[in-house]
Amino acid sequence: MRIITNSLIILCFIFTGSVSAVPYERGIPTEAQWDLKKPITTLMQLRQQKTLYAFVGDKLRPVAEICPNQGFYASAAEGDYHKIQFGNAQGYLEAGYLEDGYFEDIVSIKPDKKIRFLSDSTKKTDYPIYEYLITTKNTPIYSDKDTASSQIAILLSNLRYPVLSRTIKEDADGNKINWFEISLGDRLGYISSRDVKPDLGIPVLTYHHILKATENHNFRHTSTTTSLTAFTEQMNYLKDAGYETLSLNQVAGYLNKSVNLPGRAVALTFDDGLQSVYRYAYPLLQENGQRATLFVISSRIKSKTPKWAPNSLQFMSWQSLKSSRDVFDIQSHSHFLHRLDNNKKPIIFSRQSHTIILDLQRSQRVLRLLNPHQYAFAYPFGGYNQRAINAVKASGMTLAVTTQQGKVRLGDPPFALKRLYALSTDPIEKFARMVGNDEYEVVNKNIVVDK
């Protein structure tokens, strides 16, 4: 059975409907089955408007409505589908609705309007991505920097889309409009800044210890102990508001421009590998269909699950870690480096490069028994310098997170990524602004960490 069926054709200029995500079914190729490096060289056009599908995060979903009689590059049909460039990856169009185009690189469609394609030489290079935009509604893509020009497609809501450049142009009334230049099907298109929001980064939230208020006697004054009530409210807000929880591997793809992600996206991280996270966070995340990265101090994994004792910091056992892998992406928080020196400074600062590398490699060997893909590191107590960064790179990691506060933005250094702390005392309205694409960054200062 085909997923993409013939549907009522909606006029491109008045498209306002929404399209729900579709599940994986036989006949739809997975991302891994496509050769994403295969060049797209054939110019095509649609005979009628059609929905474009693409992987956004982990989901295959509708991403755009492609207007008819608009040229773009597409692959020859592979099975039931053509493949065209969409954002950082590819999209899929049902075969049978394309016809070969007979266009040159620049084709007149009106006396004063032109269709422009990325040149062959440009397609062979890493065309630079300037930034991302976020769609909050169904958004027209124009053939020129003018709302009177023809629409080539409708970009659907809740998408992050790469931007090639910005241009300011006056409209007929003399108002200055900021235009985003993008590429779809290796064709240049233009989106008005009035229709979208600039992407201000992906929030990576940090948690450590979770307790019920009634059992928290020893950690009331540590910022990194979160009440179960507040944590539940925060996770339920993310679910109800439609946020997709990302792996840090997807965050890396956002930075290296290799994946497409939704506009409402957040990454959850838990440092240390405490039993309270397994007791309270794991079942809630599992129920909500959410996932997180768990940074484990590998030398502190317990052979047996300890009897619950909320007055102390208890670490997860092998059994707890194994049984929670459906939610947690288990990564390294070091083996023996999670300590402070006599001056109360992270001990990583006083260790030589080879010592740090050996520690991280040992941690990776241990954690590969739980997760063979070891690629991310959380600096103990957030302590890092260039020597630590070089050691993380040398150990084979591809990214690392700090305790510096802020969102992850395009261009950020992958071995010094920022995160955010949400406190138990934060009203849910503040939490919403913290994770949202808010113009003013919301952070909590003076964080007191559990020792």
Q: Model segments located where?
A:
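Beta-loop motif signature
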Residues: 24-80, 118-177, 213
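N-terminal pre-catalytic segment of deacetylase/amide-hydrolase enzymes
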Residues: 124, 129, 137, 170, ...
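C-terminal domain-boundary segment and adjacent tail
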Residues: 226-259, 368, 389, 393-427, ...
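Boundary regions of SH3-family modules and the immediately adjacent low-complexity/disordered segments
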Residues: 22-38, 64, 85-127, 174-210
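Positively charged n-region of N-terminal signal peptides that target proteins for export
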Residues: 1-6
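Metal-dependent polysaccharide deacetylase catalytic core of the NodB/CE4 family, i.e.
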Residues: 200-225, 262-266, 280, 286-385, ...
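Bacterial N-terminal signal peptides
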Residues: 7-16
